[in-house]
Every structure is written in structure tokens, then in C-alpha cells.
């Protein structure tokens, strides 16, 4: 199995990471899925890290039966995009969802079938400057993916490894993808949400004992919920530091969106 065509649904920060990584991959047809005014705007190019990329722009029907569909939407947009995803996903399509939360795979599988879903997540720090998405490629942890059950070294996992090989897309394969997804969800809940409510930089977790308490309490509650669902987050690989200093004023994605 070789992946020759890739469609990206959602050309924000996450979609931009995929676009810039695959734009110059030999033998790959790359497109973004959009309609109406958004399609016209994307047709003018995607500005990423001070460079403009020009992936093809496809309607959902034009993207039908691509080899790989990357869903990179904001979570609130998923419900409204399910019909488009259903249109795009053909008999030979593999779908990965790089969305926050813990149930996007199940939601998408409800309309296209679970056999088309390959579980995944992404860890990326980015920000937007006017019409441009900016991120540090070297420090980006990238995509974590895996089959939810054996065989973990499936044909499609190997195909995606081959797709990402010799690109600047960082990735790793895991046998504990559900635990990894919940582990990222834990980070989002315990770090993103308190900061977003107060509008404070990430230095608040170092400077305020009250913020530390709130974060730890949320962590405990989320871990209790996960265990009740049979998710053992101790199986998730601990993220390695990138060595990049983060200023106390830095904002996680939730606060950036607000």
C-alpha cells in the first residue's frame, strides 16, 4: 500500500504543518478541501513560516477516495463537517484526526465506519501572525499515531511512515494510542483551560500556588475518569523536552483562540 494522494480538511495551524511537510514530497498529490469563499481564499495560497504554499483546492466530491484524509478542524466544526468527510472517504481511504479531545475518531467512525480510522494526535506549538501560521519545526513534537488494537505494524501504519519519511514532519508510532490521546487531553485540560479562564501566561503555574492547585485538581479528576473508562495513562510515553525556552507570557492554543 502506497499513499499517493492526501487531502487536508482544515487549513489552520495543524493543517499547515501537514501542508508544508508534504508540499514537496515527490509523487504525492496534495490538496485542501474547501468550498465557497474559503476555497477562493485558499486558492491564493497558504502562508506558512514566511513561505506561500499552493496545494490544490478540492471540493469534497473532488477529494473522494483519496488515499489519506487528514482531519485538522477545530472540534466545534466537526459535527458540521461529517457529511463532507463521508463524501471524501472512499473504499480505499484512511482517515486520521488530528483534533483535540478524546472522541473525534468515534464521531467520524460513526459515519464512515471504524475500519477507515487510524488513531492519532498532534503536539505542536504555533501562533498566527495576520494571515500566516508560524511554528518552530525543530521543536515540534509532531504526530503520534497507531492502531487501536493489534496488529500494530499494519500495512497502513507502514504506508504513513513511508509517506512522512524524508519530510520535516515529526512522528512516532505507538501501541498505546488511546492512552496517548487521553494523555494529551489531560495536558489540554490541566494547562490550557485554567490559563484561558484567567487570561494569564503560562508563568502563572510557576508563580501562583492557587493555579498549581487548580491544575493538579483537574489532573486528578481527569485521571479518575480515564481509569473508569479503562484508560491507563501511565502507558503513554512521557514527552521529552525540546530544550526551547518558553517565556512566562506564552499562551496555549485555547487562550490564543479566545
Region locations from a protein language model:
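NAD(P)+-binding Rossmann beta1-loop-alpha1 motif at the extreme N-terminus of oxidoreductases
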Residues: 1-54
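Nucleotide donor/acceptor-binding cores
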Residues: 3-4, 67, 141
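A structural signal for isolated positions on well-ordered beta-strands in alpha/beta enzyme cores
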Residues: 7, 29-31, 96, 118, ...
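Internal alpha-helical scaffold of NAD(P)-dependent oxidoreductase catalytic cores
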Residues: 18, 87-88, 111-116, 133-239
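Generic preference for hydrophobic
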Residues: 32, 56-59, 145
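Glycine-rich beta-alpha junction loops
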Residues: 36-37, 102, 121-126, 149, ...
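Rossmann-like NAD(P)(H) cofactor-binding subdomain of soluble oxidoreductases
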Residues: 49-134
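C-terminal active-site/capping subdomain that shapes the small-molecule cofactor and substrate pocket
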Residues: 230-258
